[in-house]
């Protein structure tokens, strides 16, 4: 592959190969979350305690996100990706041996540590090899693998759990992740590119502290990251609680709840390349207008879950349709968001810039699951949990609209760093 890909086409082999990484990650993570009704039953835990799993998973990944991004910039995308995915697979296999729930939380903490390097590594791979014309779409295609994995995990692992126990299901998914790591090691060819470095040569010699100072002085990046905090609540609370919400508030079986989570992931599979495609093709490359559309849509759909879906005993068909729409919005924004972030930093700071943004999105993901579950425990229903999320997203989207004026005033399609070859 050339250092810079052709503007006029998407290179699907490259994109689909890297998408298998997110497929394996979400097959394990979302699949494990779909097993929460089984795990709650075995360990006799509350909804708030169940929500702590996702918090522990993202906690260490949030704390060290910037350092992980720096590592990705240093060792390259291939080594970071291979190490991360194999370690995640091995740790999920260890989940199956845990006799107590607190040990599962410790393993979630360690799994998040291994996962922390994967997103910066994959984002760096895309920014190094894909030109701006199709970058948001390409990032979405890679992220789409996560939705495929999430659907497979949420649909298949509960079936395995019903027949063989939840521990056997997580062993199988863990070995699959290790297999993907070996696949990436064999077939992904990383190229060292000097693209963008002639205009950015000074950045290649920066220390970690100097790089961090540049990021926190980037007001445009901070504005986008502020919205990322709100969007992060959706990827934390919703998948962590969705099967419990569908079983308890909507009175369905655990298998139907797992399938609903799978449909949520299918929606995310459509949304991840979809939002990027809308930005690339219909918004003339305007990432900011795309993010405003995502934030407004998320506030609206979570409000509808609060005042309509939860309270009026929807049919099974409506549950599936609502799950799909929620997935498009709540689980589909990542490709567009991280493309925006990467285009706001120097090409040589893509990894650490991604890590910086992950601090914000993962903070939302860490805080939201226990809060979402606590509100449901207090009121005996998830209705007020959905309402709280809608309010938070609405307020931070309004703040983003007000403060992002200087970004939208730029020449359409231009960002501080275009990551293009000279």
Give residue ranges: language-model regions:
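Juxtamembrane intracellular "pre-TM" segments in multi-pass secondary transporters
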Residues: 2-9, 191-223
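Residue-level signature of mid-helix packing/kink "hotspots" within the transmembrane helices
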Residues: 30, 58-66, 150-151, 265-269, ...
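Extracytoplasmic gate region of multi-pass secondary transporters
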Residues: 32-33, 220-273
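Conserved MFS/SLC helix-loop-helix module at the cytosolic interface between two early adjacent transmembrane helices
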Residues: 63-99
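Cytoplasmic membrane-interface "Motif A"-like loop-to-helix N-cap segments
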Residues: 74-84, 281-296
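Cytoplasmic helix-loop-helix junction between adjacent transmembrane helices
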Residues: 107-148
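Helix-loop-helix hairpin linking two adjacent transmembrane segments in secondary transporters
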Residues: 142-190
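C-terminal transmembrane helical hairpin of 12-TM major facilitator-type secondary transporters
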Residues: 285-337
């Amino acid at each position: 592959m050339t250092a810079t890909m052709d503007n006029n086409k998407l290179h699907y082999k490259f994109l689909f190969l890297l998408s298998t990484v997110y497929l394996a990650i979400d097959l394990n993570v979302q699949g494990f979350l779909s097993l929460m009704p089984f795990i709650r039953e075995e360990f006799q835990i509350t909804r708030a305690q169940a929500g702590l799993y996702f918090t522990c998973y993202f906690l260490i990944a949030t704390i060290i996100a910037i350092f992980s991004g720096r590592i990705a910039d240093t060792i390259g995308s291939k080594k970071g990706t291979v190490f991360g995915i194999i370690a995640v697979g091995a740790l999920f296999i260890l989940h199956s041996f845990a006799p107590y729930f607190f040990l599962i939380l410790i393993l979630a903490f360690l799994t998040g540590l291994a996962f922390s390097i994967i997103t910066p590594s994959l984002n760096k791979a895309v920014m190094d090899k894909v030109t701006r014309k199709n970058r948001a779409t390409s990032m979405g295609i890679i992220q789409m693998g996560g939705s495929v994995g999430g659907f497979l995990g949420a649909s298949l692992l509960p079936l395995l759990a019903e027949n063989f126990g939840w521990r056997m299901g997580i062993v199988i998914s863990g070995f699959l992740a290790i297999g993907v790591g070996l696949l990436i090691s064999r077939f992904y060819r990383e190229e060292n590119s000097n693209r963008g470095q002639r205009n950015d040569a000074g950045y290649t010699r920066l220390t970690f502290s100097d790089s961090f100072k540049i990021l926190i002085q980037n007001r445009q990046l901070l504005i986008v990251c502020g919205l990322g905090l709100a969007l992060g609540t959706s990827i934390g609370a919703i998948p962590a609680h969705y099967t419990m919400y569908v079983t308890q508030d909507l009175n369905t079986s655990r298998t139907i709840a797992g399938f609903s989570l799978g449909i949520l992931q299918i929606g995310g599979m459509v949304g991840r390349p979809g939002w990027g495609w809308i930005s690339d093709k219909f918004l003339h490359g305007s990432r900011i207008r795309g993010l405003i559309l995502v934030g407004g849509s998320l506030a609206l759909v979570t409000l509808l879950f609060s005042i309509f879906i939860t309270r009026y005993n929807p049919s099974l068909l409506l549950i599936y349709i609502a799950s799909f729409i929620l997935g498009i919005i709540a689980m589909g924004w990542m490709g567009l968001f991280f493309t925006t972030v990467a285009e706001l930093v120097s090409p040589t700071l893509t990894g650490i810039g991604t890590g910086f943004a992950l601090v914000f999105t993962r903070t939302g993901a860490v805080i939201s699951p226990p809060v979402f579950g606590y509100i449901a425990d207090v009121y005996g229903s998830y209705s007020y949990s959905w309402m709280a999320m809608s309010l938070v997203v609405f307020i931070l989207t309004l703040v983003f609209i007000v403060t992002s004026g200087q970004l939208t005033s730029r020449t359409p399609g231009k960002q501080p760093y275009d990551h293009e070859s000279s």
